Amino acid sequence: IRYAIEKGAELVAAFDINPAVLGKDASEIVAEDYPKTGVCVSPAEKAEKILGSLKPDVCIIATRSTVAELEDIFTICAKHGINAITTCEEALYPWNSSPALTSRLDELAKAGNCTLTGVGYCDLVWGTMVTNLAGSSFKITKILGSSWYNVEDYGIALAEGHGAGFTPERFEKEIANINHMSEAELKELVESGKYVPSYMWNQNGWLCSKMKLHVTSQTQRCYPTTHSEDLFSETLNATIKAGDPTGMRAVVTTETEEGITFVTECVGKVFAPDEFDRNDWTLVGEPETTISVNRPATVEMTCATLVNRIPQLIDAPAGYVTTDQYPYNEYCVHALNTYVKSRNL
């Protein structure tokens, strides 16, 4: 909210499901001493009525992680012709994980003459940063990506979803069971919505689309991470014994007709004292190039990337349009409306 307002956007409505903030000025969500906005937080169930009445240029959605969870609000926005942009991780490139739902949303958005899209930290640090860097290569044969994050920062559900604190046997049974599936079986499971793959599943699809590559195969394998000494997890309120799973490495491998292979991984685990959030990307070829982003301000970068994408969202064609189809993101020095090219705001 703060980033959008300070870049010249006008806040006209805000919604939440948290009873503690309902009816309060939206400034209380932003910061304790933030100036009053004059906009009160409304219950999420009133979103359709209020949005349909106000018809804002853009709706920012920062709630959930899968497109299925956002189907209702995306549908509301499409119905009323409101452009929608979300930090939902899958929404960055849902064509290879929820193709049927994405196609339905695409049709609804085209009928409503508006655009739906997903952005965030991954849009830039895992996306345009990589493809822009590729412009300095003569030949690329493989792209390696690795993103580390501390599951202690995201609550018990995510920690357990990564197998932190599991026994090796439980990890193999509940998480690594997909390692024994064929590519076709895994694809069917992902597209059924019964299994949510690693963020890199969607990211590889985004990268291939941006680079105009044609995917021939894609698989994911999950492996436990371990530590040589006991580690105490504050989130789990338990000590993880040396050698037991501290989390998970989810490795996505994508092959393309053009001969470029992607091997990307998300490493989510209980960090040892000397570990930190990091992102490393290597372009293998001529020349070989590696870029690293250590200790990134993930939340701030997610919000800033979204706000800087708003003018491009407004200018984009109608439909579910992923950001690989957008121009490269840019830092908006001036008010957001001055970057909109398709109409005067």
Residue ranges of model-derived segments:
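Rossmann-fold NAD(P)-binding glycine/threonine-rich loop
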Residues: 69-71, 75, 88-114
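Short, ordered loop/turn segments at secondary-structure junctions
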Residues: 17-19, 64, 88-92, 121-122, ...
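C-terminal helical cap and adjacent loop that interface with cofactors, partners, or active-site loops
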Residues: 270-345
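Short alpha-helices
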Residues: 110-139
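Rossmann-fold NAD(P) dinucleotide-binding segment
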Residues: 47-58, 67-89
